[in-house]
Amino acid sequence: MDIRKEKRLNMALQMSNFKKALNRFEKLVEQTAAQKRDERAGLFIHKEDAIGYDKFYASVQKLFGPDVKNQDVKRFYRKLCNNTDASADWCEIFGYFSSEEDPIASQLDEENLVFFVSRKRRILISGSRRRDVIKSIVKIPHLDLLITATQKGLITVFNNQDTSWITGCDYLLQLKRIVATTERTIIVWDYKAQGSSQENYFVIKPMDHCLLCVCVVPLPDHLCRDDILLGDDGGFVNRFTVNSDDFGIKQAKSKRKLQNQVLDSKNFKSVKRKLHNDWVMKIRYISALNCFGSCSLDSNHSLVLESLKRLEDNLPVREFSMPRGANTFCYCVKANVIVTGGDDKVIRLWHPNISTKPVGKLVGHMFSIAEIVTNEKDQHVVSLSSAKVFRVWDIQTLSLLQVFHDSQGGPGDMQIYSMIYDANHGMLITGSSVMDMYPLTRMIQDTKQVPHTHEREINVMLYNKYFHQVLTICSESIIRVWELETGLQVYQILEPHGFNTEVTSAAVDESGFLFATGAYNGTVRIWDFGSGQEMKVLPEGKDWKEDEHCLRRLIFLKAQEKHQQLVLALERNGTIKMIQGKEDDIYLMVIWELPDVVPFLQDGKHAVHLRMSTRDRNMAIPFPDVELIVERNFSQPTDNPTMDLLRVNCIDLLQVEGYNLIAAGTLNGVIILWNFVTSTVKKVYRPEDCFTVNPDLHPKHFKINDILFLFRTPECARRSSQDSICSSSQCESSKGPQSSKGSKQSIHDSEVKGEQTDVMVGKQQPMDKKHPGIANLPEAQPPILVTAHEDGHLRLWTLEGRLLKDMLPFTKHSAISLTSLYTDSCTRILLAGNVEGHVILCNISSFLDPPHDEKKFKQLLSWRAHSLEIIQVIYVEEKQVVLTASIDGSVRLWHALNGHYCGYFGQRRLFELSQTRDFILPCDVTEYPIEIKEESKFTEKQKYEYPLIFDREKWRKMSSVSLLFKRTPPKAFEVEQDFKFFKSLSSPKIRRYPLEGFVTENREAGIVFGSLPIYSISSPTSLRFLPLIGVEAQKDSSDGITGKKKGGHVQREKAPRRRSLKKNLVPQINLASSFFPAIPK
């Protein structure tokens, strides 16, 4: 009764806590709905009080626990934001939705499974005997070797380079040998020996019992020594210690005999202990636990887990008992569990320190379990039954992921005796009469399948920061929305602008609830991002041509009034116009259009003034109605072949901190800046000869493919000054820097020393008492323009047209046309994509600070993302990933830190953004990322001051002959040394006056031999009248050379020999004075 009462009390307590959580959840929903109503009414809500999705999701997790799924909460939150008056059911938080997919069809879809069974590879063991089966498979990860041993004595080593047959069953790490076991012997094989390696092995025998399994204990601290663990049919675990001296490994190669040698097992150090009452089926050494494990068919002593010291004594050991014993076991390091399986068909999970009861059970096999392996990276357990049925389990959730069966082979090939998992190649390997290899599905998808998100080329890619979703549009006019965290598709829209109408542009508003699309025929539609429902439409005009009004760019503007939408659009003909949408009208209308200013700037004018229109409007718009103030005698050219190149190709917008700018780039390389504060439009840059037709250059050589404003708000500038970062990739994702567009910070005056800007900034607002920290924000610097050109150059400009940086990004091939630009919210990094599929990552954090040093603009990384042209590149700050879209029809995901491939949208496998996976490349990319390392300041050559220098004059004075006679005989135990070089060193002579240089070479003789002196002899002198030389030498030699004492003896016998030698060496005539005149000193 006490137990029942306690259970009832616990259930009552749980129900009470759940009711309290539901009440708090209802209050949270009411508060969120009220806040969304206030936002729609136009009321200002502070950022600290705003309930965004991240804050809402954190509150729900706090109420109901971390098991609430992100997708379900996001769906509920989107529904609440779209309709605040709708009834909210708390069951939706827990995913109470009807699934449209068939679970059976999803299970049968092979690409959703773990292993790709249809891609299985089979290797036939050539040379094997009939009915021979593989009994053991061992993987050596660091050498990438695969060792197999058959029942009838054939041992094979597989690798990716060598296909020769050698013998072995496990690998001796220190001795670099392969060890194998037979029923009564141990074989140590030198598979790398010269000559016939098949005959160079050692046999250790006899053994007391029949050996059934073997493993090697890794001993990294002991050189030239390995320990071998053996399990036999008597239940004993044996430990053999082998050294290099036992096999003569240290002998010379000439003395080494290539023959079979039988060694006595009694000569080896070995210990054994009986741990089981039946056969030892498997033995393994677990390095993570610093102990070994052995399993047996014994029901009482099924699994033993102990250190190696327990083999030398009789102390109790850790034993795990299970019915009918265990055939196999393995250890999972991350989960810290031991997985066992045996004849009772149950997989048990044990904690290494709890041997009384398993922590979990996996039931599903219909036959005895023969092998178990683990995939540490994916936390999977793969079990194999004697009927060749494979089951893949998730070790964390204990759920079944996949079941497959090996149906190949005849009746004699039924049993699979061994199985391993190769973590290096992501492959499951089994051994029977053949060797089968099952690759992981993600390995095939990532490396062998061409990524494709759409069937056609991608036209548009957008990222919704509010919902963390990606929108893609292809040329077949299919809109798809994807989850960034998982890569799953949320919904799709077919033919959004009608049948056979291509969508060419799109944009997402600042709140993330709406997105607009523009088509080839000039129509514009506004959609609800959460549901994909169409809200408003701009119909096609009656007099429009087919491609004249094709929309190239859409930008959402911040509306001055509530319940209205404003979109800035760029048409293919270069027209920039504004489209308005009202709440009570389903049709959009064009309310504003910029005049064409390019022809007026062609004749050399630098700027054109604007006149504000006096047209009255019922509502305020971000840009006023303007007209060009031009001279009356100006005539616009009509038939000019360069007029097609004057069209605007790309635009960007800056409306923050008092700036109201539109930048445009044309096909002929002209940069135009519309400034609605100063009422001017000016030509920032114009290339030379851009208005003339040059047959040697491509017509689009000066084309600007993309243009972008680089502006750092005061809040971001303060954050950049506090965070000493070298790149934007090191920015903390939890801080969540906000977008600079539509900021409500205080406006500061902009002044640049040394140059006068024509940008007028509004008056400074009074300091807000509620936000005193705003007054301490640093002053914002003027914006910078960056342009991506057709010639492959990346150029940065001031608003006055001064070139700050002209850079040719470093890729495999130079001068590749750039197509897309992107920067983060705090303008710390700059991303660029080109037509060959490369992504360029640059650090501009320090470059934006005056005086804009060119050396601070640094390219950090470059990698090949696609084989074809990239049309859009996006950087996601909170995840530190890069999104790339290409005309090859795929949208791919990359790590921004190193350029490693994560996956593509449309794949069946979920994304793993937080987990660092192995480096892989898509099948259509073969180039590795290039990291541009900065030259360290410590690598500069250092100048040393030498205290002494070599003096040649001292060296000449100290001749070897004079030193020979001045040298005193050394004493006993004293080394005789000559310090002539050290005596020739002296302090450097510093000249107070510079040396005078002069030219001595003879230019007529040539520069090589022109500096040599040339002498001419008028008539040769007769040799018999030449004066004799050597008189002084004979005088010196006539003096008796006194013998010097050496070891107490006088040397007088060598004097005549030295005198005669001197006579032979000294010349008897003086020829130097005749051929070489005396040179005055």
UniProtKB/Swiss-Prot annotation:
Keyword tRNA-binding applies: no
UniProt name for this protein: WD repeat-containing protein 64
PANTHER family cross-referenced by the UniProt entry: WD REPEAT-CONTAINING PROTEIN 64 (PTHR44324:SF2), WD40 REPEAT DOMAIN 95 (PTHR44324)
Bias (Basic and acidic residues) ranges: 746-756
Keywords on record: Repeat, WD repeat
WD repeats, residue ranges: 102-152, 153-198, 199-265, 266-314, 315-356, 357-400, 401-444, 445-488, 489-532, 533-631, 632-740, 741-803, 804-857, 858-895
UniProt biased composition (Basic residues): 1043-1060
Pfam family, one: WD40
S-S bonds: none
Bias kind Low complexity: ranges: 726-745
Residue segments, region Disordered: 726-757, 1036-1060
